[in-house]
Amino acid sequence: MRVTTTDTLFAGLLATSFEKFRGDYPDIKLEVVISNQVHSLSKREADVAIRPTGNPPETLVGRKVGVIRQSVYGQRHYWQNRRAPLDTLTGHQWIGPDTHMGNRALETWMARKGLNDVCNYRVDSMLGMQTAIRAGDAVTVLPDYLGENDSSLCRLTDSIAELDIPLWILTHPDLKRVKRIREFTKVIGEELRQALVYA
């Protein structure tokens, strides 16, 4: 079974869940395609897609397994677990998404908050942004499932509701009755649902 997902989801949530699934279902072979590019399930480039999206393609079937929430994070040593109102963070350096990352919601939010003036460092992946803030006093927006599980970081704000994005597990309609696909989407869907509740 070929599964496609993003690097951030794989590193932050799925690697552990996939390993558990492999232990419980040793006869199902997993091939994981880690890419921020959307692979075509209709062309059978993958059997299952696990993707954050507000608008899943109508040609696919699946279910929303939760909502990815995002907050502002900073390096724990520098911030010492201090919460800060967002408006006070505009005086600090920000790390933002590069346009090639394709995170239009975050780009728009940062522009609307006037944060582009204090953002002189841009990275084209969430994992890159996470790594970059570990090195200094800058702040950035990260999915809570990444930031909360990184002991070197601390959350500085509440979750930013306008950056919430649904997480979907999707497959081609012709595959939805295939037993291994049903088992995988059921088990991994439940794991993700639980993980996102606590993130």
Report each predicted region and the residues it spans:
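Residue-level recognition of oxygen-bearing side chains
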Residues: 8, 128, 183
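A bilobed periplasmic-binding-protein/Venus flytrap-type ligand-binding module shared by bacterial periplasmic
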Residues: 167-177
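C-terminal regulatory
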Residues: 40-43, 55-167, 193-199
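Central regulatory/effector-binding core of bacterial HTH transcription factors
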Residues: 1-58
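Residue-level recognition of the GNAT/N-acetyltransferase active site
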Residues: 6, 75, 172
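Short amphipathic alpha-helical coupling segments at ligand-binding clamshell hinges
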Residues: 176-190
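Short, well-ordered beta-strand segments
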Residues: 2-4, 49, 95, 140, ...
